[in-house]
């Protein structure tokens, strides 16, 4: 509803309403960010408040006279920050416009040399962006320690050679540092104000280098086995079905950002999964029929996973992730039993997990 009582849009989906109402919803959310720094415009288009139950951030609501009937709200330029100078950041916030309520999830956005605050309609999307924004803000406040770290990652040049099929040495270095920042400073619950942010910096600074060295060693172990698996696949002259299956597995495990994209617990298992590929190829010539039988059992399990991933269009799903890593353990059980699995795994176990996901 606008200031004259005309209905502009209904519903609680922020994305749809933002698309329908154009800059009006965006301007109202940006007004909230402006309020944090005392730079709010004189006449915001709506009341803006943190949602009930979220952390307070000082004065979070504003009411102002509406713009003239003929004037549409101008979108506000995002405010740039290089330090935590914007008060508390709530997990979610609301704007109210003539009885219409929109719920949004604020996040820090990485802009390279600065961060900005934006509001998302989906909490999962906000969480991903917010972590990246927090990492950037940390980096901007840890310039000297990071300058030292960039020059002292162990065996970086050697790792970069094995990383060449995936990316550059600089991309490898960036991933190692990003994960080191995550593990040193960004354990849950995440900092929500300047005091907790500074406390994280003080706590994590002393262990940053040790954590980065640990990550680099693990990345090196993964890349060593990746190179060996690639060589063995090239030399094995495996049947097309097997070669295609292994190539797809390697692509899943070893994306360009495998260090940053793989959870730390699973990153420690990647060398074993890659060694399992090598053992599978070693055994293939001796018993191709057994390999074909196991592959036939795997295919329907992986096909349903692939379909669900496509349906989610990038949205995170913890249970689907669990299923994905169980498939890797099943491959070890099928093709490289001597490497062992940390827990019993079978097709029945995966079917049970899938059934629980579908409930």
Residue ranges of model-derived segments:
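A positional "C-terminalness" feature that preferentially activates on distal terminal regions of long
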Residues: 1-359
């Amino acid at each position: 509803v606008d200031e004259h009582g005309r209905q502009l849009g209904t519903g609680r989906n922020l994305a749809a309403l933002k698309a329908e109402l154009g800059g009006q919803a965006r301007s109202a959310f940006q007004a909230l960010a402006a309020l944090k720094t005392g730079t709010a415009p004189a006449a915001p288009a709506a009341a803006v408040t943190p949602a009930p139950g979220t952390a307070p951030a000082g004065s979070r609501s504003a009411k102002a006279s509406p713009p003239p009937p003929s004037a549409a709200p101008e979108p506000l330029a995002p405010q740039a920050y290089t330090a935590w100078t914007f008060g508390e950041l709530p997990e979610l916030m609301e704007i109210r416009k003539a009885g219409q309520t929109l719920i949004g999830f604020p996040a820090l956005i990485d802009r390279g040399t600065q961060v900005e605050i934006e509001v998302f309609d989906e909490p999962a999307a906000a969480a991903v962006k917010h972590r990246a924004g927090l990492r950037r803000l940390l980096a901007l406040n840890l310039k000297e320690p990071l300058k030292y770290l960039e020059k002292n990652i162990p065996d970086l040049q050697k790792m970069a050679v094995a990383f060449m099929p995936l990316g550059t040495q600089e991309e490898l270095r960036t991933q190692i540092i990003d994960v080191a920042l995550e593990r040193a400073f960004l354990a849950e619950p995440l900092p929500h104000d300047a005091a907790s942010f500074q406390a994280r910096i003080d706590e994590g600074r002393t262990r940053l280098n040790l954590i980065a060295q640990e990550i680099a060693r693990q990345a090196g172990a993964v890349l060593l086995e990746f190179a060996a698996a690639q060589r063995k696949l090239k030399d094995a002259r495996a049947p097309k079905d097997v070669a295609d299956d292994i190539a797809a597995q390697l692509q899943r495990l070893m994306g360009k950002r495998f260090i940053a994209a793989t959870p730390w617990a699973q990153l420690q298992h990647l060398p074993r999964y890659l060694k399992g590929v090598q053992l599978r190829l070693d055994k293939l010539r001796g018993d191709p029929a057994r390999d074909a039988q196991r592959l036939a059992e795997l295919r329907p399990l992986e096909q349903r996973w692939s379909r669900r991933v496509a349906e989610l269009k990038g949205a995170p799903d913890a249970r689907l992730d669990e299923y994905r890593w169980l498939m890797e353990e099943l491959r070890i059980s099928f093709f490289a039993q001597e490497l062992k699995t940390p827990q019993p795994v079978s097709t029945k176990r995966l079917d049970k997990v899938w059934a629980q996901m579908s409930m």
